[in-house]
Structures are given as structure tokens and as C-alpha cells.
Amino acid sequence: MVGRTIKKWWPVFVLPTFAAFVIGFLWPFIWGIYLSFCKFTTVQDVTFVGFSNYSKILLDSTFSHSFWLTVVFAFVSSILINVLAFFIALALTKGYRGTNAFRTVFFMPNLIGGIVLGYIWQTLLNGLLSKWGQPLLSLSAKNGFIGMLILLMWQQIGYMMIIYIAGLNNVSPDLIEAAQIDGATSRLILFKIKIPMIMPSVTICTFLTLTNGFKMFDQNLSLTGGDPGKQSQLLALNIYDTFYARSGPQWKGIGQAKAVVFFVLVVVIALIQLRATSSKEVQQ
């Protein structure tokens, strides 16, 4: 009876969600791709220009710099965050006293907004750099890059730690006990049992950290603003700067084209990463 009712009325329940998906995501997405082939000031003042916007991207030195800076930043931040989060999770699953308090402390930075974090860390890091006689974040591309790494690591390590803790807690104690009986060392247990068994967690955390690194915007805006001379400007901020900070209808279309390229880049790298890490997962 219930099954027949669901079969009869399921479109009524699906329709609101589907309509929200089409209106809120699908239609803006398709329209955004079309606008990347146009020059415009508003959506009612659109002129089709073909691939002109995409060809101009290739000649934009700020875009190419932001592109490669973002790729390096995303991979470096992903590696550092995952390695540190895993070893912190490993330490916090040993049953030491105060473990829950440490978990809470490590997770709390994830609850703070990116803009607020950017200004907080800007004050902290500039104070330290000034004391040490080093260039401020806005005056050194190297210091700005390192500052963004520190900020993102501080913000996200706690969240990834929770995922790794969940994975480590699901590793069967029987497997570890059997390995210990067979004379396996702690190092061997870590690399041959624990890490292979938590590969689903590694897949999730790597995906999240990679995509977060690629699309980082608010922290970049508030911490360095892309200074000096846009040398610390990541791709999301470069797109924003192109779309809003430059005048003229051609820049709107170029900014939209950059956004499409950015979307394709993130999707391709995320799919490659998911395939690579998923293939290492152990069937339980």
C-alpha cells in the first residue's frame, strides 16, 4: 500500500527540489557558460563574441600567474593539511587523557569565517614579521603565500582530523591484535593495516582539501588582497578582480570565461584525484 502511494505521488515530492535545483544551479550554470562567449554589462545587454574572451585569457599574464600559483598552493596545502591532520588524529586515538578537549580545540578554527580569519592572521603575522625585520604580507609574495598556507592549515586541519579519527576508530582491533601476535612493529601496522583501511577517509579529505585550496577566495582577499602587485593573487580572487574591478563590458565576459576555465580545472583534477585514491581503497 505504502509502495503504491509512493509510486503514485513521488513527482509531487521531487518537483520542489528539482525546481530549486534548476532555478538555483542548472539555469545559472548554463547561462554562465553562454555569457563566457559574450561581452556584457548586464544580462540584458549581451553581445556574442565567440571565443574572443578565451583567446584574451591566454594573453593575460595575471591569469597565468594566478593559475599556476593556485595549482601549487592547492597541492602543497592539501599535502600538508592531510599529513598533519592524520598524525594528530593518530595521536588522539591513543586513549590519552584530555583527548576530547584537544579534539574540540583543533576543530574550533573551522567554525570561524574566512574573512575574519584573514584579518586575524594578517594582524598576527604582520606583527611577527615586523618584529623579525621581515617584509609584511602585502609587501612580499613569498610571505603572503606562506601566510595563506598557515591560515588554511590552521582552519582545516581540525575538520580533516575528525574524518581521520572516524576512519581510525573503524579499523578492527582484531586485525591489529593479529598483526601484533605475528610480530608486526608499530610502523608496519601503520603502513600495512591502518592507512590501507582508512583510504576512504583519505579520499574524502584529499578531495576536500584540494577543492578548498583551489577555490580559496575570502582568506586570500582579507589576508593579502593579492598584493604585492597581484603576486599573491589566487585564481578565485583574480576572477573576482577581472569581473568587478575592471571597467568595460569586455571584462565581464573575460571574467566569466576565466570562471568556466576555473570550473573545468577543478572538476578535472578532482576526478583524477578521486579515481587515484579510490583505486587504493581496501574492500572490507
Model segments located where?
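A structural signal for multi-pass alpha-helical bundles of membrane permease subunits
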Residues: 3-284
